[in-house]
Amino acid sequence: MTVQRSGPPVETQKTEKSIYLLLALTTALWGSLYTANKFLLEAVPSFTLLCLRYLLSAAAMTAFQCFRKPDPQGKPRHIRGSDWKYVVLFGLGGYVLSIGLQQYGTKLAGASLASLINCMNPIVICFFAVLLLHECMTVKKVVCIASAVFGAVCIVGGDAGSGHLLGIVLSFASVLTWSLISVFMRSFTQKYDALTVTTCGIYVAAVATLPLMLHELATTPGVDFLHPKYILVLLYVAVCCTAVPHSLWNYSLSRVEASTCSLFYPVQPLTSMVLGVLLLHEHMTVGYLMGGALIVFGVLYSTLGKEKQA
């Protein structure tokens, strides 16, 4: 795949602010996924949950595709046959392999340590963006990343402890996979409509995880997720934690630099922290407050601060 160095024309300030809001919403919705998954995994095996999430998400996105207007930039919705291999790569690499590694990494290393490793995403995305897309690293981006990542460390680092070595390796592999896919997605969505690429990628993921779901259902007795409370949360996960944020993430990647998108990633643990306190009655610590303040500062500075070349 040829990585395009140049992106679209520089966005107006008003458009940039709108995209920043979309990025904040995207990462906040992903942050709520941790709380929802914690509830669903009590009744649904992990790959069954993943497959149902993708199947429902694909259905929702297909319905939306039928009623949406054409892309304002005129990008095609029909993907050429020679480019489908990249869509399969996005689906298998970004939505199956990366998430699967994250799930098993969390299981082996522990949730706190896995979350701490996941905070490396902005750094790795910026590294690949500079290396492959030749994006410029500015002083503002460095300050934002340092502030946000250190804030995320404050939130989850206190309880990280020591984890299984394989779990740590799998968690790092998940970060590398997702970051690399995000950078390639930035290049690919310069050519095709972002929502179409997302929809097709999620269909690939749904098909790929279907055999895993069938195996889990055949080997796991007593699986019952048809209770209304599970169905409602599953629909929330499929639409609000998958279809909407994945589409917004890929759309944002098509409009602004990948390294800029990565600055909003630490909003995830901040959202997870707030929901954990409000819904799961988790204890609020000084580290939580410090981390939250640093993340908010990083996000605000990324949207309001002036650029300086590093």
What is the predicted function of each stretch?
Residues 2-51, 160-187, 207-209, 310:
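Glycine-/small-residue-enriched transmembrane alpha-helix faces in small-molecule transporters
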Residues 29, 33-34, 62-114, 118, ...:
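Specific transmembrane alpha-helical segments of multi-pass solute transporters/efflux pumps
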Residues 47, 61, 125-126, 131, ...:
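Transmembrane alpha-helical segments that form core, pore/gating elements
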Residues 50-52, 113-120, 184-207, 238-278:
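Helix-helix packing/entry segments at the starts of transmembrane helices
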Residues 33, 56-60, 117-131, 146-147, ...:
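Alpha-helical transmembrane segments of compact multi-pass small-molecule transporters, enriched
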Residues 28-31, 35, 62, 91-96, ...:
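Hydrophobic/small/kink-forming positions within alpha-helical transmembrane segments
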Residues 61, 128, 137-157, 175-176, ...:
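Hydrophobic transmembrane alpha-helices of multi-pass small-molecule transport proteins
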Residues 15-20, 43-47, 51, 79-84, ...:
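Juxtamembrane helix-entry segments on the extracytoplasmic side of multipass membrane proteins
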